[in-house]
């Protein structure tokens, strides 16, 4: 049992106190703006039969919290009281004690003392929305997902993927997988000490420890864990002192068979302004990339989110979002949330026309939209072949492979059907395009160099 968990068995004032802790955690995690928008007017009403009852000020706030934050709130309550099994959010207050938490002090890094530096609690740094159960798996992320799952399920032993290095563009799921690892371990192996934090926060805590002469405490905190997860490691590029400390922390953990998980926006070999000895170590274990989403994966993500939020969205709207919002998962989910929120606020039906109007600014940025012709030109230039080779029937490998890659990218980055794509490649039929896509997907499973090449092409085309 975690030493910082508060176990309460009675009701009344104790639960009011727990709600105060939960509210503080929500404030710390989501920030002042979001907290004031959704949580500041929520009241604790009572607890009954292991259920906590909260009161929201309006039906809309109630429904929004239920759809997006109910699991977060439940897990926070369970952190302080493991007898709580569910929460209920109502809009009509019941008789009894109520507690509203409205103004909470912001806790800055400067306020963190040595006792907090040594805290084993990672709960407040994990987002309960990010679990393995709600991670949608597809060809672009299946290796990263399988590796993350293996790390989480290693039951105290170090996985073969040590360190596990996840890399890819913004909003593609790297952070989701790291949070999922943390949640899984805390739920199934609560005795294991886990730390998750960004590389930026790692640096700030190191600087703070130097300033306050608490370096020993800092080293003990990070070198005594069972699992250390550092997000966005590219942040330490060019920061020599932080790199030095990270290097020794890395060595200590690996030498003691402790697991490390690291994320980055590029592969270890592409990192600049970082020591070669660190770059080499980052590639010791499994390097798994999370590349840009396909139409099918975007469709699956949308359907999963819609099911979680228990809303009804017309099929043509879902298809439109999956076809048009191609940059990353974060932007895709944000677009869906914006459409739903607009409908709730205005009480207007969700239609394709309304969706196009609501998202017109976002669509404009995505509509630098990549055409099949753009892809053909870029791939032909990249592989030094003639543009006319894209529509030819030449079977030479140096021509056929770039053509297959261009077909794969056309499916991933445009809303065109297989038949339409085939027409752009010398009037080839849809089965030829399907074969090309399948061939590239098979190659991507084992060819790291090809994955990096396609990721680079996607970034060039999208930017």
Swiss-Prot record:
The keyword S-adenosyl-L-methionine does not apply. Keywords: ATP-binding, Cytoplasm, DNA replication, DNA-binding, Lipid-binding, Nucleotide-binding. It is found in: Cytoplasm. Residues 344-463 are annotated as: Domain IV, binds dsDNA. GO terms for molecular function: ATP binding; ATP hydrolysis activity; DNA replication origin binding; lipid binding. Its main location: cytoplasm. Residues 83-124 are annotated as: Domain II. Residues 125-343 are annotated as: Domain III, AAA+ region. One of its GO terms (cellular component) is plasma membrane. GO terms for biological process: DNA replication initiation; regulation of DNA replication. InterPro entries: AAA+_ATPase, Chromosome_initiator_DnaA, Chromosome_initiator_DnaA-like, Chromosome_initiator_DnaA_CS, DnaA_C, DnaA_dom, DnaA_N_dom, DnaA_N_sf. Domain I is involved in oligomerization and binding regulators, domain II is flexibile and of varying length in different bacteria, domain III forms the AAA+ region, while domain IV binds dsDNA. Oligomerizes as a right-handed, spiral filament on DNA at oriC. Belongs to the DnaA family. Plays an essential role in the initiation and regulation of chromosomal replication. ATP-DnaA binds to the origin of replication (oriC) to initiate formation of the DNA replication initiation complex once per cell cycle. Binds the DnaA box (a 9 base pair repeat at the origin) and separates the double-stranded (ds)DNA. Forms a right-handed helical filament on oriC DNA; dsDNA binds to the exterior of the filament while single-stranded (ss)DNA is stabiized in the filament's interior. PANTHER family: CHROMOSOMAL REPLICATION INITIATOR PROTEIN DNAA (PTHR30050:SF2). HAMAP family: DnaA_bact. This is Chromosomal replication initiator protein DnaA. It comes from Rickettsia peacockii (strain Rustic). The gene is dnaA.
């Amino acid at each position: 049992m975690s030493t910082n968990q508060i176990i309460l068995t009675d009701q009344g004032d104790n639960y009011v106190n727990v709600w105060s802790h939960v509210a503080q955690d929500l404030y710390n995690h989501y920030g002042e703006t979001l907290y004031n928008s959704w949580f500041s007017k929520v009241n604790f009403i009572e607890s009954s039969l292991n259920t906590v009852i909260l009161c929201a000020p309006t039906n809309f706030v109630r429904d929004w919290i239920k759809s997006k934050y109910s699991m977060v709130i439940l897990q926070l309550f369970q952190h302080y009281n493991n007898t709580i099994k569910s929460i209920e959010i109502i809009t009509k207050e019941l008789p009894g004690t109520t507690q509203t938490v409205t103004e909470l002090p912001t806790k800055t890094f400067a306020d963190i003392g040595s006792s907090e530096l040594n805290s084993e609690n990672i709960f407040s740094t994990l987002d309960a929305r990010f679990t393995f159960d709600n991670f949608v798996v597809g060809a672009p992320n299946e290796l990263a997902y399988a590796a993350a799952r293996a790390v989480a399920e290693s039951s105290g032993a170090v996985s073969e993927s040590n360190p596990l290095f996840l890399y890819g563009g913004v909003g593609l799921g790297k952070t989701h997988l790291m949070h999922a690892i943390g949640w899984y371990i805390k739920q199934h192996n609560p005795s294991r000490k886990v730390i998750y934090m960004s590389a930026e926060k790692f640096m700030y805590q190191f600087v703070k420890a130097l300033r306050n002469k608490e370096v020993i405490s800092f080293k003990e905190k990070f070198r005594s864990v069972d699992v250390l997860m550092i997000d966005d490691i590219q942040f330490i590029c060019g920061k020599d002192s932080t790199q030095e400390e990270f290097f020794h922390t890395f060595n200590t953990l690996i030498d003691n068979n402790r697991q490390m998980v690291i994320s980055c926006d590029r592969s270890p070999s592409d990192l600049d302004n970082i020591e070669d000895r660190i770059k080499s170590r980052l590639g010791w274990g499994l390097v798994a990339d999370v590349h840009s989403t396909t139409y099918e994966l975007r469709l699956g993500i949308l359907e999963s989110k819609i099911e979680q939020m228990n809303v009804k969205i017309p099929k043509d709207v879902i298809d439109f979002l999956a076809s048009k919002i191609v940059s990353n998962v974060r932007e895709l989910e944000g677009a869906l949330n914006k459409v739903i929120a607009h409908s709730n606020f205005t009480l207007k039906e969700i239609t394709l026309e309304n969706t196009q109007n609501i998202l017109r600014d976002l669509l404009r940025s995505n509509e630098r939209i990549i055409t099949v012709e753009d892809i053909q030109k870029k791939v032909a230039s990249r592989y030094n072949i003639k543009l006319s080779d894209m529509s030819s029937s030449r079977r030479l490998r140096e021509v056929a492979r770039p053509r297959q890659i261009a077909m794969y990218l056309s499916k991933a980055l445009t809303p065109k059907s297989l038949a339409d794509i085939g027409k752009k490649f010398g009037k080839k039929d849809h089965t030829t395009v399907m074969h090309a896509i399948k061939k590239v997907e098979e190659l991507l499973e084992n060819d790291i160099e090809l994955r990096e090449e396609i990721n680079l092409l996607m970034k060039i085309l999208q930017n």
